[in-house]
């Protein structure tokens, strides 16, 4: 099932080495901005979710066989959660990428009895992605929404 998580964009600007794509007012400009926000707010995804950390390596851009997992986390039961981010629309091809990462973590990182599951977070989940994940019980889909609230600090009255 798709779950909605409402987030607020933080005010700090991050330097990234990506070209900006045209952005709607309700999405992050860069995947790294979404990643940084979620790393600081993993509880929005699931209570008890923590960033993976071991031997000085954390779960941000976690290396897996020459590629990188956007966020590797551990849930409240101690199981791994592989999180793949798409700043705009999530298409079905992301499923293969996520399954490859899940298989790598199962093979290289897990202890006996430890499970691995995946989460895809995108601004918009395509119908093809919904269909592709419909029989995969180990993958959850989330759509994110941004909101911005303004608070008057001082009025400029005459």
Which residues does each predicted region cover?
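Charged, terminal alpha-helix-loop-beta segments
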Residues: 1-158
């Amino acid at each position: 099932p798709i779950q909605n998580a409402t987030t607020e964009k933080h005010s700090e600007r991050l330097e990234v080495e990506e070209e900006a794509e045209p952005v709607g007012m309700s999405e992050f400009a860069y995947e790294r901005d979404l990643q940084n926000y979620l790393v600081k707010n993993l509880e929005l995804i699931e209570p008890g979710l923590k960033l993976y950390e071991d031997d000085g390596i954390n779960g941000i851009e976690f290396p897996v066989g020459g590629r990188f997992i956007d966020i590797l986390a551990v849930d409240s039961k101690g199981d791994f959660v592989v999180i793949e981010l798409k700043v705009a629309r999530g298409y079905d091809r992301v499923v293969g990428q996520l399954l490859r990462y899940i298989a790598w973590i199962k093979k290289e990182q897990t202890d006996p009895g430890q499970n691995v599951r995946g989460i895809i977070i995108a601004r918009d989940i395509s119908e093809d992605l919904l269909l592709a994940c419909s029989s995969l019980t180990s993958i959850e889909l989330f759509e994110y929404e941004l909101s911005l609230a303004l608070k008057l600090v001082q009025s400029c009255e005459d």
